[in-house]
A protein has these predicted regions:
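Extracellular glycan-modifying ectodomains
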Residues: 2, 21, 206-207
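Sec-dependent signal peptide recognition
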Residues: 3-10
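Alpha-helical transmembrane segments
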Residues: 10-14, 132
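Short, well-ordered coil/turn elements that cap or connect secondary structure elements
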Residues: 14, 60-62, 127, 161
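C-terminal motif of bacterial Sec signal peptides marking the signal peptidase cleavage site
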Residues: 16-18
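Serine-esterase "nucleophile elbow" of acetyl-processing enzymes
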Residues: 20-73, 79, 83-92
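Short histidine/acidic/glycine/proline-rich micro-motifs that form metal-
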Residues: 38-41, 45, 71-75, 103-106, ...
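Alpha-helical cap/lid subdomain in secreted, periplasmic
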Residues: 81-208
Length: 208
């Protein structure tokens, strides 16, 4: 009798967990990239832009998803905040991938300011019932350990506060590796873009 009860309890728990996973799955037909030069295609021809590569990669895996790009080179989180409302005047997307913060770090902007700007951007997107994939960035140690600690913590904090889908580091496997970067060692080359695309693709597919 005890064994039967335990079995029933196990089935109930398994069913609840399985349902919760299914509830988090989302239907994705359209994606927006919203970032800076790391997403905009800086130094690359149009066919090598992240939006183009990601769309092709998803299609090769059997997913027909339109990937749009509203990333602008040089944008800080403040710049992104100032223009985001106009992007959604007549368009909505199933998933918005946020890739902002690198230029804030390069300019030494107070991490508290960066975080507040990102909070406002996130809230605008969520109010329009669009899902978010937040990509993280890390600060260079040359900014100082205190700055780096505060900046690096921005992204996991936002992930937890808003329960967001999260990619801890946009440039995972790419940063500071000559093979994957242009001569400035900052902006990804085609190989770098392909690696970023593959990393994003795996997360996106897991969401569906």
């Amino acid at each position: 009798m005890i064994k039967i009860k335990n079995f029933i309890i196990f089935i109930i728990i398994f069913s609840v967990l399985n349902c919760s996973k299914e509830d988090k799955k989302i239907k994705i037909n359209s994606i927006l990239l919203f970032g800076d030069s790391l997403m905009s295609g800086y130094g690359l021809i149009e066919e090598e832009h992240l939006s183009k590569i990601l769309e092709k990669d998803l299609k090769l895996d059997g997913y027909s998803i339109n990937v749009s790009n509203e990333s602008i080179s040089g944008d800080t989180t403040f710049d992104g905040l100032n223009r985001i409302e106009n992007i959604f005047l007549d368009k909505n997307y199933d998933l918005v991938i946020i890739g902002l913060g690198a230029n804030d770090m390069l300019r030494g902007i107070n991490p508290n300011v960066t975080k507040k700007n990102l909070e406002k951007i996130i809230e605008i997107i969520l109010k329009k019932n669009m899902k978010i994939l937040l990509t993280g960035m890390v600060a260079s140690p040359t900014r100082g350990l205190e700055y780096k600690k505060k900046f690096d913590q921005i992204f996991p904090d936002l992930k937890n506060t808003y329960d967001l889908n999260f990619m801890p580091f946009l440039l995972k496997g790419v940063a500071l590796r000559p093979k994957y970067n242009q001569s400035d060692l900052i902006h990804p080359n085609l190989l770098g873009i392909k690696l970023i695309s593959n990393n994003l693709k795996e997360i996106i597919i897991d969401l569906m």
